[in-house]
Amino acid sequence: MIVGNYGIDFLPREGDVRDYNSALILGADGQRVGRYDKIHLVPFGEYIPYKNLLFFARKLTGRVSEFTRGDQRKVFRLGSPQGGAHRYGVFICYESVFGNEVREFALLGAEVLVNISDDGWYGDTSAPWQHLNMARMRAIENRRWLLRDTNNGVTAVIDPYGRVRQSIPRHAIDALPAQFAFRSDVTFYTAHGDLFAWLCAILALGTVALAGRKLLRQWMASSQVQKSQV
């Protein structure tokens, strides 16, 4: 079982308490397997950037913006009804937006991806559907099944080709029995991240630079011809 959790660490030596936006992983026996603390926090929603400069923001956001950033991506081994254990990569809400970060779970050996999300912030807008489509991209990039569980968004089972195989409508309280498979192959994107995109960007900039240089030479040559005619 994987559930959203308010993680708390007590640090008696420092006299401090740290709060985390966490996912708690429980085994079939009900015992705790581990906890994942969200790493990519939402600015002003989960933490205040540049606290010293934006000191007034604390009064506006309250305690909701005091989460501590997690420091490690983890993959959890859970038993299967068919026997054996499989590796799950669990990430939280907004983290599904960042492909270069989600791929690290696959690199760590995750055979299936799990995204738990609170989409209640968005209301009845297109945002929950956009969030779903971003999760579909993560499934395609890493060629993994992706199980998406939301409180008020689109709960869905997504296959490695980004197709939504099963889903629960928004605002519905329901359970979704799902069939999915475990995969361990490594895609180009999983291995290299946004390398291809960066190469395309460099190629595009180089093409623009060469075209601009050619136009500049033509303009200079035309200017010289006009001056010589005068």
What do these predicted regions represent?
Residues M1-V230:
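Enzyme catalytic cores with a strong preference for nitrogen-chemistry domains
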